[in-house]
Structures are given as C-alpha cells and as structure tokens.
Regions:
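Helix-loop junctions at the membrane interface of multi-pass solute transporters
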Residues: 8-10, 35-44, 57, 74, ...
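Loop-to-helix junctions at membrane interfaces in multi-pass transport proteins
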Residues: 10, 14-21, 56, 133-277, ...
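Central hydrophobic cores of alpha-helical transmembrane segments
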Residues: 378-389, 442
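Transmembrane helix-loop junctions in multi-pass membrane proteins
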Residues: 8, 78-92, 116-122, 236-244, ...
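Terminal cytosolic tails of multi-pass membrane transporters
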Residues: 312, 398-450
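Helix-loop-helix module between adjacent transmembrane segments
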Residues: 18-116, 191-193, 284-292, 324
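Short, small-residue-biased leader/transition segments that mark boundaries at the very start
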Residues: 1-7, 11-12
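Loop-to-transmembrane helix boundary motifs in multi-pass membrane proteins
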Residues: 58-68, 303-343
Length: 450
C-alpha cells in the first residue's frame, strides 16, 4: 500500500508531520481491521471485482443504484487524483531536464499508458513491488547522506534560513510557523488516515488476493514499508531546509525539495550522477505506481460497472477490454487537461481527491463490513453526502468569498467523513431493515471470522 505519492509531503517537517502520523495510523487500521474482513465478504458477496460491485452485492441492489452512484463518484475524484500524479511527472522532468512542463506532462502520461495497456492489473501489481522498493531505498538514503553533509552545522543552518520561531520551534512537533499548533489543525492532518478505508485502488487489492493467508504476511510488509517511508519523508523535510540553506525552496517549489536534494548530493557533493539518476527513478516510480492504479480503477468503473451493467449487458471480455482501453485514454487526456497549469499544486490535487474518495466510501465500507443494520438507502445517501460535502467545502465560496476549508481550517475529509457516517446511520435506522438473506450473509462472514 503505497502512500499515494509521498512527494507533496516531503516539504517542511512542521507542516506535514501530523499528516504522516495520520497516514500511518490509517494504514495500520486498514490492514488489521479492513483487509481480512473485506476479503471474506467479497467471497460471500459473489466474488466482487470492483468496489461498486461489492456494495451492489453486499446490499442486493438489483436496480444498480449503488453501482451507478459509486461509479460516478469514483470517476469524478479519480480524474483529479490522476491529474495529481501526472502533474508530479511533469514537474519531475521539467526540473531535471529543463523540458517544457507541458511536453514533460505528455511524455509521462504516455509511459504510464503504455505499461498499463500491456499488462493491466497484473502489470500494476508487479510494477508496484519494484517501484516501491526503488522509492524506499531513495527515501532512506538521500536524507541520511544530506544530514551527514550538514550535521555539524544543522542547527545553525536552520536558524540562518530565518524560519519562524528558530530551530527549537522548527523541530517541535507541536509548533507551526513559530506558534503552537491548534487542536483543529492537528485533528485535520490526522484525519488523512481516515481516507484509507475508502480508497478503491487500495481496497481492490484486498479483494483480489488469492489466499487469505497472504494478507498476514503482506500486512507486516506494508505497515513496515509505510512506517519507514513516512519517517524518511519527514526526515527529508527536516534535513532539506538545512541542506539547501543557500537556496531554501518556498511556495510551490517545496514540492521539488527531494529532486533538488538528489541533484545536489550526487552531482556537487559526491560526484556520482548515475546513482542520483537511479534515485530520481524512485520518484518516477512513486508517480507511476500511483497513476497506473488510478487509471485502472477508473477504467474498470466505466467498463464493468457502467458499460456492462447498463449499456451492453451481454458484452464479452473482448469488448469490455476494448472499452477499458478507450476509457484509460480518455481519463488520461482529461487528467492532462486538469494538470495542464504548471503552477497547479500537487498537494492540493491529492488532498481534494483523497478527501472526496475517503468521505464518500470510507463510512460506507466500514458500516457495510461491521454493522448488520446497514442498508442500501443509508449507504446511497451516505456516499452522496460525503462526496458533496467535499465539493462544497473545498470549492464553493460561502463565507465572505472564501470556502469553508479556508474559513474554518478544517480538512474536508474530516467533515465529510463524519457527516457521511452520521447520515448513513440515521437513514439506515429510519428505513427498512435488511432482508433476512442479507443478514444471513453478514452472519456467515461473522462465523467465518471466528
């Protein structure tokens, strides 16, 4: 389970560390609480292949209301999510080679499309492992070398950059810009962890595992990988400011701090540019491993959940594959348009997409797996509430020309998740209870878990 492109988080320690903590806690909960039960329920609920299909089978939605709504939500937010990955690739090539951002964006998209076409889900899972290892080595090695180069001047360099509050405040987890963190700020950053239980491209891996025994081994590897990579990402943010003391990155440039560190360490300090190139491939690996999953999930929602379910019910595998490939191309093109602005914030795009998917599907999945009384009306309203809350919170100026996200300082995922969960429970209790057959399936999963 990769960390959904780490590089927006590898900026300044004081502004991102709580997000890293939230992501780690979310990863642990996802693997220990969600993975095994979702795998078992997937078998009971007709061996579902996608998240919308699982929800449809879980609640016996013969009219396919859940399927259609879930697919639309996935397509909307995955377009933004995919755009963030493509924007990362564009900025990577632009920074390293000086290539025009727009050309770099197109090149990166072409590479991702090529191997997604060639291997589909198998290629995605295989490349995930290789890319993940390369990225982890880079994340661990570069900040350690950079720290060794400035270790004797670390505190002095931090103070020299005139960071708010000085060195002591910069290194204090509870300080932000020279002032104490507000509780709502910490809570909002920790809330990133809630998103994991609603991420379709993560959950389908639990659903697709061949043997449940593999989940235990995989959970150890995934949690360990997550811990190491997030600690390294924060370390990059801490060391980066001291190491780049004569060229402190500000604004949107902070998203390229890792790239800049690699270039300087292996060209100016050590003089082994080849090794630096390998680690830059680690950044590209993170981008690729995120984008390919996003493209495939979005394409599956269109080809299987919409096309086969509503447009061509008798479609064979060959036709579905054709629709999938066409969808991948269309999604990539739209994502390129969204990411076309060189000044677009990768962190902003990731944040919006993560919040939308987490708010819409997180509560729905948790209740579907663990609450016997959950029903289809509650799940439908909950998904819509979560998705709309994020869109309204982040994009519609309601107070003095500002959005609620700006006015309150609260991350939309926290608000959307809570509202979606609350509405789901209330509507489920206020409407007809699940049928005896649905309850029997739930109890079958319970018995299987004992």
């Amino acid at each position: 389970t990769r960390n959904r492109t780490l590089f927006p988080y590898t900026t300044l320690f004081r502004s991102q560390a709580w997000i890293a903590i939230g992501l780690f806690l979310g990863t642990v909960c996802n693997w220990l609480l969600i993975s095994k039960r979702l795998r078992r329920y997937t078998i009971v609920a007709g061996n579902s292949m996608t998240l919308p299909e699982f929800l449809e089978n879980r609640f016996h939605d013969k009219k396919k209301v859940l399927l259609s709504i879930s697919s639309v939500v996935i397509i909307i937010f995955f377009l933004v999510y995919t755009a963030s990955a493509l924007a990362s690739g564009g900025k990577l090539f632009h920074t390293i080679f000086g290539i025009d951002y727009h050309i770099a964006l197109i090149i990166g998209a072409a590479v991702i499309l090529t191997y997604t076409f060639m291997g589909g889900f198998l290629a995605v899972c295989t490349t995930d492992f290789v890319q993940g290892m390369l990225m982890l080595v880079g994340l661990l090695t570069v900040p350690i070398i950079a720290f060794a180069l400035v270790s004797g001047k670390f505190a002095a360099n931090i103070d020299h950059t005139q960071v708010a509050g000085g060195y002591d405040a910069y290194m204090n987890l509870f300080m932000n810009g020279g002032r104490p963190y507000k509780f709502v700020e910490i809570l909002s950053q920790l809330a990133w962890g809630l998103g994991y239980c609603g991420m379709p491209h993560i959950l389908i891996r639990f659903m697709a595992v061949k043997d449940e025994k593999e989940l235990k081994k995989s959970s150890v590897i995934a949690i360990s990988w997550c811990f190491l990579s997030l600690v390294a990402a924060c370390f990059i943010g801490i060391v980066g400011r001291a190491y780049l003391v004569d060229n402190v990155l500000t604004g949107g440039q902070t998203e390229s701090v890792f790239i800049t560190m690699i270039e300087r360490v292996f060209t100016k300090n050590i003089g082994i540019p080849f090794v630096g190139g390998l680690f830059l491939c680690g950044i590209l690996a993170a981008i690729m491993s995120t984008a390919d999953s996003q493209l495939l999930v979005c394409a599956s929602s269109v080809s299987k959940d919409i096309y086969k379910s509503f447009i061509r019910k008798d479609a064979d595998d060959k036709r579905i594959m054709k629709v999938t490939r066409i969808t991948v191309i269309v999604v990539a093109l739209i994502a390129i348009v969204i990411a076309w602005d060189p000044e677009s914030s990768i962190m902003g795009l990731v944040s919006d997409a993560w919040a939308g998917l987490g708010s819409a599907f997180g509560p729905a999945i948790v209740l579907a797996l663990f609450w016997k009384r959950a029903n289809m009306p509650g799940t439908v309203v909950g998904i819509i509430t979560g998705g709309l809350t994020v869109l309204i919170w982040d994009y519609i100026p309601l107070m003095g020309g500002k959005t609620l996200a700006v006015t309150t300082g609260i991350y939309s995922l926290l608000t959307g998740f809570i509202l979606s969960l609350f509405v789901n429970v209330i509507v489920s209790l206020a409407t007809k209870a699940p049928s005896a057959e649905i309850v029997a399936e739930f109890e079958k999963v319970d018995a299987y878990s004992e």
